[in-house]
């Protein structure tokens, strides 16, 4: 599929690629004016040759992350991974079997190290050791059967620096399958999915020609519009090309961008309004239930309060009744004591009368005796 069929317009793809490469060549020449620095800094020249070119895309909608730390593999015509780069292969135990397969397939210059899971856990345990392993190799390949276990073992040091291991299928255990998978991995570019509306994919190097870059860009755009961007090519807002040292050169801008943004906002508002209605409708029965529960609670509380009030009344009345009874008892006791005293008083008066009578009789007798004498 041509770029015109994909985007619906004649995008000057090769012109943009050649303009970017020309800009980079001028930048390098301006930075390396001194001839002596060109002779001495050979490493810098090599690094400039492998300066990556990035395809930057902006989308109308957010891209979800459904890959679970597995990168998208995008086949391209011109490899972005240099053939001189070294790879590390992470495999299941025992690792000796896969080392023999690498030698048998003639990949010992490409896959320079094979590591089993048990050795990876034991030897590269600390953060510093994992960082050294990450910086030692250009690309990491991993048996697709161990991919789910690697995030926990390798940690953030790998996944934050875009050194996500590329899955390869080597379950058959043959040299032919291993060679085919490694060649396919080197002939592709990768995209680590994340929730975003703007992202970049490596599409080549400054050492490539403008035609090679244009071919890679077309392959990437076809894959992205089919597998990554929602709504396909219609969901792309803009396309740019850039390097790490250059500005973003526009390749294509959606001519209907304003209308699409306005329509998408309307759709969003409609969706939010419908979701609010649904939430309100769903909340109505819950509100009714809540009201019923509150009414039931209130009736329960009122009943409990009435019961407690009754208990308090009975508790208050019981002492009164008890006090009345006690008062009655005390009054009865007083009356009994008074009756006893009343009964006892006549006895005392009779005895006193007898005593008085005897004394009076004695006095009378004494008076008679005096008269006789």
Swiss-Prot record:
Comp. bias regions, Basic and acidic residues: 292-320
Region (Disordered): 265-373
Keyword list, A-Z: Nucleus, Ribosome biogenesis, rRNA processing
GO cellular component: nucleolus; preribosome
Skewed-composition ranges (Basic residues): 362-373
Compartments where found: Nucleus, Nucleolus
Chief location bin: nucleus
GO-annotated molecular function: RNA binding
Compositionally biased residues, Polar residues: 347-359
GO biological process: assembly of large subunit precursor of preribosome; maturation of SSU-rRNA
Subunit structure: Component of the 90S pre-ribosomes.
Family to which the UniProt record says this protein belongs: Belongs to the universal ribosomal protein uL1 family. Highly divergent.
Protein task: Involved in rRNA-processing and ribosome biosynthesis.
Name of the protein: Putative ribosome biogenesis protein C8F11.04
